[in-house]
A protein has these predicted regions:
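Conserved active-site segment immediately N-terminal to the catalytic lysine
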Residues: 1-9, 37-42
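Short glycine-enriched loop/turn motifs at secondary-structure junctions
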Residues: 7-11, 102-105
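PLP-dependent aminotransferase class I/II
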Residues: 19-191
């Protein structure tokens, strides 16, 4: 429930669901310093309890989640229908055969282009804010130096191409069409 997520708290928060009762007991201890009883640690745990303030905020925000998700889908529809630039690769909508079982909630709208940095500058010059989420591939993170020798060409290609367009329940359709217009006016080598 990171604040920037579709259902976000005021600060970091999270939840785990399971139907495994044994796992429930372990997880409850792990979130409470590894303990079921005060000062009786049976695991190396952490303080990961959801405090009352975060729970209250999430409870209120949950009431608006469906409407906000519908708004995100409206914006995505504008993007999918409007962006026609052949230099941009758009995300695919949920496949028809999967729609019976799944719906996309569109946390992010991530496009790809071989000219990402140029596009980002062009969009910025046109008043469109973008983000590069997760700018360093996992296998190149310091914590994973044991993987640094791996050859992951698809990961690295995608890493160099991804760009997140604005998407959120407060974005107006007019603003979404402005994003579309800016994307469509991008020309390779124009910057």
């Amino acid at each position: 429930f990171y604040p920037g997520k579709n259902l976000g708290a005021l600060g970091d928060a999270g939840a785990i669901t399971t139907n495994d009762e044994e796992l429930v007991q372990v997880l409850r201890a792990l979130r409470n310093y590894g303990s079921h009883e005060k000062y009786q640690n049976i695991y190396r745990g952490v303080n990961s309890r959801l405090d009352e303030l975060q729970a209250a905020v999430l409870s209120v925000k949950l009431k608006y989640l469906d409407a906000q998700t519908a708004r995100r889908r409206e914006i995505v529809d504008v993007y999918l229908q409007g962006i026609k630039n052949p230099n941009l690769i758009l995300p695919l909508p949920v496949d028809k055969c999967v729609q019976e079982f799944a719906e996309h909630v569109w946390h992010l709208f991530v496009i790809r282009t071989a000219h990402r940095d140029e596009l980002q500058k062009h969009l910025q010059d046109n008043g469109v804010q973008t983000l590069i989420h997760y700018p360093v591939p996992i296998h190149k993170q310091k914590a994973y130096t044991h993987m640094s020798g791996l050859s992951l060409p698809i990961t690295e290609l995608i890493h160099d191409e991804v760009l997140s367009l604005p998407l959120g329940p407060t974005l107006t359709l007019e603003e979404a069409w402005k994003v579309v217009s800016a994307c469509n006016s991008f020309r390779v080598g124009s910057i």
